[in-house]
């Protein structure tokens, strides 16, 4: 039995070293469009069914396929209007199934980070070698298709395992979105490299707000504005991060898009205080400027709960 994952130290939000983002900004804002492929009849997994309904589930499949056929383009057009880039949580199968989407993202200089191969192929039950193969596929596939070396990770369908952090650190990933413990980046206790947890969000993730909680579009927009306003206020003390995880099959429905646009307009109206960035840009800046100060503060306050010996990450 294990009481906690021992992936990071308890580090109270108060009295940390003050983070200042580039240009003196108070809040780092990033968008995470999840561009995924769901299989009509996926392979079975002992830890989780592929679909909540009996498989094959044409309803669930076709709704998500709508997201890639229609919703993505509608969402991309909206983000273009606000001159916002996405950091794409990518199922690498998108490269084969929907290459036009990948090309459009590259054209706009969007970031890609790993979200597995298919979002219906879970990591539960995999050994380290099998999970390593998924990670290597992500690195290789995105590099070949886009020229980008991916630096971030979100386990497919959030099926993080006990091996995930050490594996992605071994391959010189900079950040993971699998942890939800903070509103600022935090160093993680991996044996290699400088891996951080990147604030993602379940609270404002459209899968939760629309799929689980059944919020109205107006309510969701209000939640986004409140989330932003609070984090911006706290950014006066020390820089915060706000991420909006998105799924086009949800947020880009015709009756929902205008209210999401209203929320983005509210956020963009505070441009003087906001760093609009990709997740990789946030991670790179934090690792270079704030990593050492964070570790020193954790150590000085007697909060470290286990030694972290960092070694060079594996090149790929």
Annotate each language-model stretch with its function:
Residues 2-197, 221-244, 250-316:
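Catalytic alpha-helical scaffold of carbohydrate-active enzymes acting on polysaccharides/glycoconjugates
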